[in-house]
Each structure stands twice: as structure tokens, then as C-alpha cells.
């Protein structure tokens, strides 16, 4: 078995999907989790205005609406805007919320918390790079989401999918630190298919993907940061042949991000050796 085959198997990616079936699969997954954990009544998710949070948010809203209808209990979905100061693409985030139609929409500006943390570190003699500050932003967003979830008997939804997972393109214990991943198994183009099936405006899934964490590189496209396109990543995940250069980049990211795919390492773990 090649490394490509191993990765595809581990991430559960199918070369071809039925969008309506995958929507139902994710919704049922989200419903089952709440039903299994009777102390939970809420899903929480940060909404950026990008493809992934838009899709996960709509799936979460559908799940709680069906649960309310099925059980008569007050399940809910809380969508949270988490800008750092003023977000350049705030209009996109609002369009995403209009599409998702969450039960509750909150806005928590993380700028004061992030800047305070950076000042405290600087005062201790630790100079924080712009890249590192970007990771602080991602982790602060998750701190806020878990704070809300803790107050409302909730679980936090993550947006990690196969194209993001294979490259490790997420912050460890930041956007990578969630309770459930309803998009896991889907690559980037398959996520677009689900949004199209759900009737989303094309603008919500055709915009250029960006983590937008670095102030020195505002809005830098994921594909530039990764050095490979999502089309090539998706092709790799679907078992297709990609160029040697792209294969090398993708597999290097896979190895580099292995530690992000595991809980804290114990003496019994050997994946890193």
C-alpha cells in the first residue's frame, strides 16, 4: 500500500460522492451525538464567512431543527462571529449567517484578548512573531467558543476536512481543537458540492480560501501558503495521479503535521519515531 493509499484510507475520502447522501450523513452524525449525550443541548461554531464554517454551520442548524421536531426538546445552534478588530470580509460573514440562519448569532471581538496576551508575553521578554500571533488568534477564538459552550450545555463543532487535515493546515488546539468534525472525510471540492446542494450562493464557496491570521500577509491565500492548489490536493485524496512536485509537497505536509492529528503524546505512542 502506498502512502497515498494509506492517507486516503485514514481520512475516509471517497473519489466520488452523492452530495445529498453526505449531507444526510453529517446531519445524522450531529443529531446522534447530542442524543447520545443527554446533558448536551447546544452546538457552537465560529463563523468566518468562508466555505468550511458556512457548510458546518448550516449542517448544525439543520441537525438541531430536526432534533427539536423529533423530540420536542430545546436544542439550539449558536453561531459566533469572532473578528480580530474589523474583519475585511465582514460582508461575506454576514452573508454566511443569512444562509445558515442560526438560532442565535453572537459577536465576540477577540482583539483585546489577543493584544493583551501579546503584551503580557512581551513584558516577560518573549517577543511574539506575526505568525505566532496568528496562532494566538486561532486559539483565542476556540477559548471563546468553549466558554460559550460551557454556559449553554454545548459542544464545539470544528471545520477540519480532508484537504485541511492532510496538510495540517490548522492551528493545534486552535481551530483544530473541537469536539466534532462533521466535514471529516470530505475534500475541498466535495464541500463545495454539499453547499451547492444546500442552495448556497456561489459566492459563499467560490471565494479564495484564506486563514487570514497574519497581519504582515493579510488575506494570504491558503494555496500560496501551502505551495500547492486545492485542486491538486483533492486529486491526490481521490487517488488520482498528481505531479511529483505536488505529491512531494503534500506528503511533506502530511508528515510535518502528524503531531496535530494526535492528542498529547504518551510513552506508548510511536507514530513520531
Curated annotation (Swiss-Prot):
Keywords: ATP-binding, Ligase, Magnesium, Metal-binding, NAD, Nucleotide-binding. It catalyses: deamido-NAD(+) + NH4(+) + ATP = AMP + diphosphate + NAD(+) + H(+). The keyword NAD applies. GO terms for biological process: NAD biosynthetic process. ATP binds at residues 46-53, 159, 188, 210. Pathway: Cofactor biosynthesis; NAD(+) biosynthesis; NAD(+) from deamido-NAD(+) (ammonia route): step 1/1. It comes from the Bacteria. Its EC number is 6.3.1.5. It is an enzyme of class 6 (ligase). Mg(2+) binds at residues 52, 164. This is NH(3)-dependent NAD(+) synthetase. It comes from Streptococcus agalactiae serotype V (strain ATCC BAA-611 / 2603 V/R).
Amino acid at each position: 500500500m502506498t502512502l497515498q493509499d494509506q492517507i486516503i484510507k485514514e481520512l475516509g475520502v471517497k473519489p466520488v460522492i452523492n452530495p445529498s447522501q453526505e449531507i444526510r450523513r453529517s446531519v445524522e452524525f450531529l443529531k446522534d451525538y447530542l442524543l447520545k449525550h443527554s446533558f448536551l443541548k447546544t452546538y457552537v461554531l465560529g463563523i468566518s464567512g468562508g466555505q468550511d464554517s458556512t457548510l458546518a454551520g448550516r449542517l448544525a442548524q439543520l441537525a438541531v431543527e430536526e432534533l427539536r421536531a423529533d423530540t420536542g426538546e430545546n436544542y439550539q445552534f449558536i453561531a459566533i462571529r469572532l473578528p480580530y478588530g474589523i474583519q475585511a470580509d465582514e460582508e461575506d460573514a454576514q452573508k454566511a449567517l443569512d444562509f445558515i440562519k442560526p438560532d442565535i448569532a453572537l459577536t465576540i471581538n477577540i482583539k483585546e484578548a489577543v493584544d493583551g496576551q501579546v503584551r503580557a508575553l512581551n513584558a516577560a521578554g518573549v517577543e511574539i512573531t506575526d505568525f505566532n500571533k496568528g496562532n494566538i488568534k486561532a486559539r483565542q477564538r476556540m477559548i471563546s467558543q468553549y466558554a460559550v459552550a460551557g454556559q449553554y450545555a454545548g459542544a464545539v463543532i470544528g471545520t477540519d476536512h480532508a484537504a485541511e487535515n492532510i496538510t495540517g493546515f490548522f492551528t493545534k488546539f486552535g481551530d483544530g481543537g473541537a469536539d466534532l468534525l462533521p466535514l471529516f472525510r470530505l475534500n475541498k471540492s466535495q464541500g463545495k458540492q454539499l453547499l451547492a446542494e444546500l442552495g448556497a450562493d456561489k459566492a459563499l464557496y467560490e471565494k479564495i480560501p484564506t486563514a487570514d491570521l497574519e497581519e504582515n500577509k493579510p488575506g494570504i491565500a491558503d494555496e500560496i501558503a501551502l505551495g500547492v492548489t486545492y485542486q491538486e490536493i483533492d486529486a491526490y485524496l481521490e487517488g488520482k495521479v498528481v505531479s511529483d512536485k505536488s505529491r512531494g509537497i503534500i506528503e511533506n505536509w502530511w508528515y510535518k503535521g502528524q503531531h496535530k492529528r494526535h492528542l498529547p503524546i504518551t510513552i506508548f505512542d510511536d507514530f513520531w519515531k
